[in-house]
């Protein structure tokens, strides 16, 4: 029984090696690539961007607003006050649990 399993495993390995070693294209055939649709179109800026602004004229308050239609709590790492509030909630929960004992 074990010898049959070993033979089947070796045949599977040989088949996998044969399939992996097969050429993808026949001799002389050139691969076809997808067309780059829209490659010549200009990149559209974000709706809140202003081309007249330079780095010096950039309004830093825009960084506090959520990007596009993303929910405000999508990236709490950018808002340290969220982390402070979250830590305070955890501390109050742990302290209330210890007073019940």
Curated annotation (Swiss-Prot):
Domain of life: Eukaryota
Biased composition (Polar residues): 88-101
Span list, region Disordered: 26-101
Positions of the UniProt region annotated as Blocks active site cleft of host thrombin in a reverse direction compared to substrates: 75-78
Subunit structure: Interacts with human F2 (thrombin); the interaction results in thrombin inhibition.
Function statement: Salivary protein with anticoagulant activity that inhibits host thrombin (F2).
Family (UniProt): Belongs to the anophelin family.
Protein name per its UniProtKB record: Salivary thrombin inhibitor anophelin
Species annotation: Anopheles stephensi
């Amino acid at each position: 029984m074990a010898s049959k399993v070993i033979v089947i495993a070796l045949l599977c390995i040989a088949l996998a090696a044969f399939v992996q070693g097969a050429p993808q294209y026949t001799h002389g055939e050139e691969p076809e690539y997808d067309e780059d649709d829209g490659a010549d179109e200009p990149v559209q800026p974000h709706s809140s961007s202003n081309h007249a602004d330079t780095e010096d004229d950039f309004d830093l308050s825009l960084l506090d607003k959520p990007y596009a239609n993303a929910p405000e709590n999508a990236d709490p790492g950018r808002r340290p006050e969220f982390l402070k509030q979250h830590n305070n909630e955890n501390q109050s929960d742990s302290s209330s649990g210890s007073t019940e004992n």
